[in-house]
Amino acid sequence: MDVKWLDVPEGDTEELKRNVFFTTLEQLKAWARSNSLWPLTFGLACCAIEMMGVGGAHYDLDRFGSFFRASPRQSDVMIVSGTVTKKMAPIIRRLYDQMPEPKWVIAMGSCATAGGPYVKSYSVVKGVDQIVPVDVYIPGCPPNPAALIYGINKLKEKIRYEAKTGKKVL
């Protein structure tokens, strides 16, 4: 970014270029949001055990600025893990609607992304993306905690990219 340095002595312009940070307000908000994600955990099966491992001392999701919340009104990310049944679908939708904007969804595991091994059952939803819009898919049965951290980091990149370019990433 070219800036005209008015009334600044020649030696001080290099010092200013090294120490002054230029950005837009949208990029600053996206940076703050991406570094303070508060996920709502919605564990329905064995993937939830791996999600609990992320909160433990070995992986410690807190060091990335993400703190698990029990209420959808305090969350901005919903992590859905496990088999979603048709009976559970309206509850997931209601929780998603209770979350404040902006909000994002992570589908964790084969069951949440595509129905998993129970996909041919009459009562299983063929992926949580049929209920709520999903931003990040994490494959695996079950995916390990490192994969969930990777997915959260990809969501952070997506938030920053959308603010920088103004384009919605699908």
Swiss-Prot record:
Cofactor: [4Fe-4S] cluster
Role of this protein: NDH-1 shuttles electrons from NADH, via FMN and iron-sulfur (Fe-S) centers, to quinones in the respiratory chain. The immediate electron acceptor for the enzyme in this species is believed to be a menaquinone. Couples the redox reaction to proton translocation (for every two electrons transferred, four hydrogen ions are translocated across the cytoplasmic membrane), and thus conserves the redox energy in a proton gradient.
InterPro entries per UniProt: NADH_UbQ_OxRdtase-like_20kDa (IPR006137), NADH_UQ_OxRdtase_20Kd_su (IPR006138)
Keyword Metal-binding: yes
GO CC entries: plasma membrane; respiratory chain complex I
MF GO annotations: 4 iron, 4 sulfur cluster binding; iron ion binding; NADH dehydrogenase (ubiquinone) activity; NADH:ubiquinone reductase (non-electrogenic) activity; quinone binding
UniProt-annotated binding residues for [4Fe-4S] cluster: 46-47, 111, 141
S-S pairs: none
Species whose genome carries this gene: Geobacillus sp. (strain WCH70)
Cofactor binding comment, as recorded: Binds 1 [4Fe-4S] cluster.
Name this polypeptide is given: NADH-quinone oxidoreductase subunit B
Catalytic activity: a quinone + NADH + 5 H(+)(in) = a quinol + NAD(+) + 4 H(+)(out)
Membrane topology annotation: Peripheral membrane protein
Oligomer status and interactors: NDH-1 is composed of 14 different subunits. Subunits NuoB, C, D, E, F, and G constitute the peripheral sector of the complex.
Keyword presence, Acyltransferase: no
PANTHER family: NADH DEHYDROGENASE, NADH DEHYDROGENASE [UBIQUINONE] IRON-SULFUR PROTEIN 7, MITOCHONDRIAL
Residues passing through the membrane, by range: none
HAMAP family the UniProt entry points to: NDH1_NuoB
Protein family according to the UniProt entry: Belongs to the complex I 20 kDa subunit family.
Predominant location: membrane
Gene Ontology biological process terms from the UniProt entry: aerobic respiration; electron transport coupled proton transport
Subcellular location, record wording: Cell membrane
Class of this enzyme: translocase
EC number: 7.1.1.-
A Pfam family reported for this protein in Swiss-Prot or TrEMBL: Oxidored_q6
